[in-house]
Amino acid sequence: MTTPASRAAQSTADAAPSDNPLLDGPGRLPRFTAVKPEHVGPALDVLLADAEKALAKATAADTPTTWKDFVLPLQHATERLGHAWGIVQHLNSVMDTPELRETFNQNLPRVVEFWTRMGQDQALFEKYRAFRASPAHEALDAARKTAIEHELRDFRLSGAELVSPARERFAAIQEELAALQQKFSENVLDATNAFELLVPDTEEGKARLAGLPDDAIASARADAERQGKTGWRFTLQFPSYFPVIQYAHDRSLREALYRAYATRAAECSPQDNTALIQKILALREEKAQLLGLASYAELSLVPKMADSPAQVEQFLRDLARRARPFAERDLAELRAFAAEKLGLPELQAWDIAYASEALKQARYSFSDNEVKQYFALPRVLDGLFGLVERLFGVSITEDHAEGWHPDVRFYRISAGDRLVGQFYLDLYAREAKQPGAWMNDCRGRQHEEGGVVQTPVAYLVCNFQAPVNGQPALLTHDDVTTLFHEFGHGLHHMLTQVDTLAVSGISGVEWDAVELPSQFMENWAWEWDIVESMTHHVKTGEPMPRALFDRMLAARNFQAGLQTLRQIEFALFDMTLHQQAARALAAGETDPVQRILDAVRAEVAVLLPPAFNRFQNSFSHIFAGGYAAGYYSYKWAEVLSADCYAAFEEEGLFEPAVGRRFLAEILSVGGSRPAIDSFRAFRGRAPELDALLRHNGMVEEA
């Protein structure tokens, strides 16, 4: 089988009309503005036909079972298909239109059907097994051997060992799940965009804006004007929503936005995801049972570091036990402050962020908005790029390539005169763009025939507040850490030195280890040398005062106990859900999802949301992303990343040898060996929890 369709590959002979930009192949950068919905179907006609021919050739009896004759030609054809479809997927995420959405959904079953059928192809499976047992396999390097092992594992996980009618049922489930997960994602986007709250331009309206930062007010005004309206327009886009929840003195304004945000895609919405969630869970469970596994949670863990759901649950509960005393202390302090200083004796869900920000300001004498004035995006990028250059001996410069929106920027990473990789930056929120932040690969690294190296290209996407009133975009410190996080993923993809496509970069990396480089990079946003280099006040040009940074640092672990328990709540809900919900549905229970979530909260949470909250209906990570029975990966990988960062703390933050070792043992090797082996090679031992607890301030003082 072949790796996921978002990966890139060597282009094969182009038997296609030259005017279809989706047929360019990964050898050139995408012509995004040339891609139209009407290109998708014809391009897939050509690419699917080419892939079918390559599959037939690979399984033919007279095709030698060697890497060159058997593996590479099929990889070339299928990766060309994957590259084109990856462009369509990407555009559907960042430039959603009714026309593109329609053609995406029309063609999604065609693509899924091909990948599923190839993953179940008995002749191909047998040929891979024969290759695995052949002398030709013994001559392969370690990366190619790992790629073959992954292929064989993925065949089994695709139902290749099933017999009819189970095999056909498995394929049907794959297609239905792809459609349901896409619909879940669309519903979240549409429900987010469906809401607006317009504050009128009156004295009473202006009074409702009290407490909001100037840039949030200006952005709301500009948003209203773009819609041809007067006043201030607030939406559920995060850069619009969160300043209200965090700063607005008007409690009714906070409540209105919270209620809308917490019930996105819920039963009160035309885009209700409740039934979709239940269907997704039932199909995932059936898929696992067809493969002889006890639950989807077990199936999800097969290619991951963790051995079993029980091991994951033990890890999460142990961390919850350690975090709980700190969370209880956090909540008690917040309630006391809110009652005494804010006149809020009974904290509601829409008061939490507001009261927390007020407490932080009172305790540490700064606000997030004050800090934001120092983090202008251009300067932040300069600081981030300078850090990467210093740590890993590369240079980052702006480059030129066609984007999909005027705000998109393009960069190249070089080592001396050698091109290492390139990346697109798309950083501002738009209504036609999926919420959140992510990195995805445009194409992967591989060593091509003739000695040419195809260099990797990445998409880096965030949803920050766009510039207003001619000023540069200003980032909160949370935004800065988000940018560093996604850039860590990008470095993992772009700094790889593995020449085998299926295990280069992030390809083939265990999902519960893939967050290691991203969470590792977050730590640098808390180092004074880096912060000093990337800050200047947007109006005065002055660098951030060290005293302000010291107050930020003192507040770094503010409410860390509450935040840790919240992440554990999500992770334990996810893992429990994928073991229990489908069976409960089959037994006739109406809404086991809410019951399971309530039970998890009763076990681990100290702060419970209101009964109307339907967080799960927009939990795209597990119902539309890659984190189903895998959300624990964030905390699992944080143990690894904190321990890796501790090596820099111990040996010197900018000690060149440590940076070179992290590059060589973690970033460069991609998925070519087990993540635990990469960790041990860097750290010289097994992972330890101590650094995570220390970094989160969850160590009792002596």
Give the ranges of each region predicted by the language model:
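C-terminal, non-catalytic "cap/extension" segments appended to globular domains
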Residues: 2-39, 46, 219, 231-233, ...
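Short, hydrophobic/amphipathic alpha-helical patches that form generic packing surfaces
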Residues: 79-90, 149, 153, 259, ...
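Active-site-proximal, well-structured secondary-structure segments within enzyme catalytic domains
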Residues: 143, 147, 176-179, 186, ...
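Short, glycine-/Ser/Thr-/acidic-enriched flexible segments
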Residues: 239-242, 287, 416-418, 427-431, ...
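Short pre-active-site segment immediately N-terminal to the catalytic Zn-binding motif
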Residues: 465-484
